[in-house]
Amino acid sequence: MKLVTAIIKPFTLDDVKEALEQLGLLGMTVSEVRGYGRQKGHTEVYRGAEYSVDFVAKLKVEVLVEDDTADRAVDAVVNAARTGRIGDGKVWVTPVDTVVRVRTGERGVDAL
């Protein structure tokens, strides 16, 4: 099993969710996060004064998948979240040893 983690722009969430659902992936965890990469934040103007904003609001999407689905899930997220502009995000895949569905005690792929 794999954990596909994506950091995306908030306005792309609906497209990412729909792309993952088309793969049959119906469960995901979404968290509001803040960070920066190469863009190193941005500046905003408030009441005529310019302020530097170091951290940019993003969403972290996490999806547990079977090994053979990971590449398709990554492609789906990338295609749905890409705007072609700085700050589109990152996607990475992490191996997962064990998953347990708390309610039933099911383990492994059955818990997905």
Task: Kindly label every feature range from the protein language model.
Residues 1-112:
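Positively charged, small/polar-rich N-terminal and surface patches that mediate targeting and assembly
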